[in-house]
Regions:
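Acidic, Ser/Thr/Pro-rich beta/coil linker or hinge segments at domain junctions
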Residues: 177-210, 234, 250-253
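A short pocket-lining beta-strand/turn micro-motif at the edge of beta-sheets
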Residues: 46, 144-145, 169, 217-219, ...
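Conserved beta-sheet core of the metallophosphoesterase superfamily
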Residues: 130-189
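C-terminal/domain-terminus segments
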Residues: 50, 58-76, 147-173, 230-255
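A short C-terminal boundary segment appended to hydrolase-like catalytic domains
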Residues: 206-269
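Single conserved hydrophobic/aromatic residue that forms the stacking wall/gate
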Residues: 1-9, 13
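Extracellular/periplasmic catalytic domains that process cell-envelope and extracellular macromolecules
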Residues: 41-44, 140-142, 164-167, 212, ...
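His/acidic metal-ligating clusters that form di-metal
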Residues: 10-156
Length: 269
């Protein structure tokens, strides 16, 4: 099958944009949002830590890429589709890298391909964009930054959070699942290709700095007065009582109280 990555992608973009901007959509509810605002306002702690279930970062992918992900997750994983996926990702990443390097030769059409973005999961905070912006506005007003802890997706993520004006408001540290399957099952594509997806995701999704899409494990976060250290830890298998920590895929981030990196260690197979 051949994927149409133009008209349908545009329709999805228009429909989802309208829904996301509905001010009546709420993930917290009025009472919980008021409680959270009061807690943030009264807190004297060094760290403002928000533990909750779903991703808060803007996980916005090029609209045509969302079509590909939908096709794959529906089970349409044929050699032809995989070849199209590879080509599409290669094209989008190349355009995005040229854009980041301020390439003046990019065409309007090419720029549109990477700037026409849609959320891939409206059950997360991306589906409640107005309320998320309200929360970010509260943080800005209080002159506080937040460390958001998340899960839900069964995959590991790290992101920098920004409001719609581009102001940095915090970081998100999201854990993988201990045993439940992640994208390695839902996308049903080879592990090596998933690793290529990881690289593509961190290039194409502006807020995303790290992801692991195929391994099970946990996230260990340690707070001191001087820094927060996050360690993503993965095991080589969950199908056997005998397992080892896969140190080749570990990831560590250390941040100071302003949430700027003290150091970062990446080891990616």
């Amino acid at each position: 099958s051949t994927l149409d990555r133009s008209s349908a992608a545009s329709d999805v973009y228009k429909r989802q944009t309208t829904d996301m901007q509905d001010p009546n959509r709420t993930l917290l509810g009025l009472n919980q949002r008021a409680w959270l605002t009061q807690q943030l306002a009264s807190s004297k702690a060094t760290w403002q830590v928000l533990g909750q279930q779903v991703l808060m970062s803007k996980m916005l992918v090029p609209a045509e890429m969302l079509q590909v992900l939908s096709a794959i997750s529906s089970g349409a994983v044929t050699p032809e589709v995989l070849a199209q996926v590879n080509q599409l990702i290669k094209e989008l990443v190349e355009i995005k890298l040229r854009y980041l390097n301020h390439d003046p030769s990019l065409t309007v059409e090419q720029l549109s391909r990477i700037k026409t973005v849609v959320p891939y999961n409206l059950d997360s905070w991306d589906g409640y964009a107005v309320e998320r912006e309200t929360l970010y506005g509260t943080l800005q007003y209080l002159n506080k930054k937040v460390v958001v802890l998340a899960g839900d997706t069964h995959n590991a993520w790290a992101s920098d959070l920004h409001d719609l004006t581009g102001q940095f408001v915090g970081v998100e540290l999201a854990t993988s699942s201990v045993s439940s399957p992640g994208m390695e099952k839902y996308l049903s594509i080879p592990i090596q290709q998933l690793k290529e997806f990881e690289s593509a995701f961190t290039t194409l999704i502006d807020e995303l700095s790290y992801c692991n899409l195929n391994q099970r494990g946990y996230l260990k976060v340690r707070f001191t007065a001087e820094q927060v250290q996050a360690d993503w830890i993965f095991v080589d298998t969950i199908k056997n009582k005998e397992y080892i920590v896969d140190e080749t895929r570990s990831h560590q981030v250390i941040l100071d109280p302003t949430l700027l990196p003290v150091s970062a260690l990446k080891q990616t197979a």
